[in-house]
Amino acid sequence: MPINYEYIVVLGGSELAYTSSITNKLSLNSSSERLIASVKLANEKKNRKIIFLGGTSSLLEQKNIIDETDVAKKFFRDVNFDLKRVIFVKETKNTIENLKKLKKLNLRIEGNSILITSAFHMKRALLISEKLDLILIPYAVDFRSFEDSGRDGLINYYQMFSIVKNLKSLNLYFRELLGIIAVKISM
């Protein structure tokens, strides 16, 4: 990864906006590494800015519910990160809208920015950015793997087998696969 990049582009998706709204507390999901990595990388050089792309993926309007951007803002505040170094892009529903709005910012991001998202989502995000002529350097986080993968032997594998976890993984895989197909067809 190049050392001299100016912008850290973070895709939303690690925030539990509904839970955060109800509890009035910061609530993140298993993709929270996206936010954590952005702060870590931004703190390496004081001139780096974070561009947070988020909104709500809900197709229905939800009153009195904060969105991903509001939760991310709370996260940055809670870790004492200077909000003047964060550009928040709101009101998007998916990665295509996120990256289209990023392009409209007219910042000098070409080859000067890294893209942080979950490893499982990176292929689709880069495909979209390529279709939009955005050159972003990938920085994958949130790698998903078998827990306790250090164990070996059939008995131990059988003990780790979980239908629910496997169905969640399969759901994630098919969602990304359908997303990639949709991008290739529609863009």
Tell me the role of every PLM-derived stretch:
Residues 166-187:
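A transmembrane-helix-recognition feature enriched in membrane-embedded lipid enzymes
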Residues 1-159, 163, 167:
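A structural signal for short, hydrophobic/glycine-enriched beta-strand patches
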